[in-house]
């Protein structure tokens, strides 16, 4: 019950109800984008600080496993979606890539929940978040290139597309900043990036609830396949 009454969940429910009731409630797009940037960089900074205090050797095996998992899940999802014959190739690749990677906001919600329940987790989880994103996107790009007969695309273009994307760039940048400064040396930003994090996350989930309610109708088109 405590988990259900978490403010993050309640804000999502409020947004979903507002959307279903056709309310004009919306988080302004410019502010929504700002919140997205804030959450991504905050996740990165927190992860960098936690990584600074963890044993680097203990991260190697989980990173390798995560990289393999990103490739396997993306290809498996693409295979399953193709077998349903309900999706165009481009749509199947896009959906499979999303399944293979991970939502940074979903990650933030889960971390917030674990902290509220006093459940411990490994310090390097933010690093794995980035590692899971990279192979999934690369696999998705390669699948799309092969599907469109553009398999000869330069590997440099693929790498650029992956690492210069907003999510990866901000999280990796945040990891570097967090690892460099450490928690005790950066108290001047703790309030903004740490103390206010859950409040901004609630506003983000409010908009996510609205968006989700508007996309429920899409289930009628694809059924329960997803």
What is each of the regions a protein language model found here?
Residues 34-36, 42:
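Metallocofactor- and cofactor-centric catalytic cores in central/energy metabolism, strongly enriched
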Residues 1-19, 26-30, 56-196, 200-208, ...:
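Alpha-helical transmembrane segments of multi-pass small-molecule/ion transporters
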Residues 25-26, 37, 51-52, 201-203, ...:
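A generic structured-segment signal
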Residues 211-226:
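A beta-strand-loop signature enriched in Asp, Gly, Thr, and Trp
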Residues 41-56:
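Active-site-flanking structural segment that lines cofactor/substrate pockets
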């Amino acid at each position: 019950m405590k988990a259900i009454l978490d403010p993050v969940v309640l804000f999502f429910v409020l947004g979903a109800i507002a959307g279903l009731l056709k309310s004009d409630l919306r988080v302004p797009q410019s502010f929504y984008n700002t919140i997205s940037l804030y959450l991504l960089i905050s996740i990165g900074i927190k992860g960098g600080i936690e990584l600074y205090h963890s044993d680097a050797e203990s991260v190697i095996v989980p990173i390798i496993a995560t990289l393999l998992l990103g490739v396997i899940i993306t290809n498996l999802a693409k295979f399953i979606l193709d077998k349903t014959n309900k999706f165009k190739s481009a749509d199947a690749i896009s959906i499979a890539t999303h399944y293979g990677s991970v939502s940074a906001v979903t990650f933030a919600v889960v971390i917030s929940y674990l902290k509220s329940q006093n459940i411990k987790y490994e310090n390097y989880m933010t690093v794995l978040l980035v590692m899971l994103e990279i192979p999934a996107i690369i696999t998705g790009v390669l699948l799309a290139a092969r599907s469109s007969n553009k398999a000869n695309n330069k590997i440099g273009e693929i790498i650029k597309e992956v690492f210069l994307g907003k999510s990866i760039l901000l999280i990796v940048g945040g990891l570097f900043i967090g690892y460099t400064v450490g928690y005790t040396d950066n108290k001047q930003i703790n309030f903004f990036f740490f103390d206010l994090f859950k409040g901004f996350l609630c506003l983000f989930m409010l908009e996510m609830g609205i968006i989700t309610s508007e996309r429920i109708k899409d289930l009628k088109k694809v059924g329960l396949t997803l």
